[in-house]
A protein has these predicted regions:
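Amphipathic alpha-helical effector-binding/dimerization core
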Residues: 1-37
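Glycine-rich, flexible loop/turn motifs
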Residues: 1-3, 7-9, 31, 40, ...
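Basic side chains
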Residues: 4, 20, 79, 113, ...
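Extended hydrophobic
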Residues: 44-122
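Aromatic-residue detector
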Residues: 12-14, 70, 80, 127-130
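Cysteine/selenocysteine-centered motifs that mediate thiol-based redox chemistry or coordinate metal-sulfur cofactors
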Residues: 33-40, 121-132
Length: 132
């Protein structure tokens, strides 16, 4: 699995698990502005979602499930799962993800990774709450 992350490399919100989590939990007017005014959609792989309506549906699903998935949408052979870190008294403060070879992120493996990340998100949220 020859995948390397380049420090400082950026990617659009709509095609990464971290970005999709950020989109899903931003205020609805910000999401609309992003989808209709701010972004020029680029297809990175045949799986990249570039239609605003599909991305709105994806955001709703992410809010419902509590995690996002990048299904090789930014890079072939790489899948990612992302979760938000939310504080009840504020807006989203962080997000984090796990990435790996697509073969390691299917079916129950994907659900297990999402569950582990959600547990870590809860712990981070509790720690941030004690610091506030």
């Amino acid at each position: 699995f020859p995948y390397r992350t380049i420090i400082g490399e950026t990617a659009p919100l709509y095609c990464t698990s971290l970005g999709k989590v950020m989109m899903a939990f931003m205020p609805s007017e910000e999401l609309e502005a992003y989808l209709t005014q701010s972004v020029s959609f680029h297809t990175f792989t045949r799986y990249t979602i570039t239609e605003p309506d599909r991305l709105r549906q994806e955001a709703a699903l992410i809010r419902e499930k509590g995690f996002s998935v990048d299904n090789e949408e930014h890079e072939y052979g790489v899948k990612c799962v992302g979760v938000p870190v939310l504080l009840p008294e504020s807006s989203q403060v962080a997000a984090f993800s796990a990435s790996g070879p697509a073969s390691a992120f299917d079916g129950s493996d994907l659900e297990q990774k999402a569950k582990a990340l959600k547990e870590a998100s809860f712990l981070m949220r509790e720690r941030l709450r004690t610091l506030a």
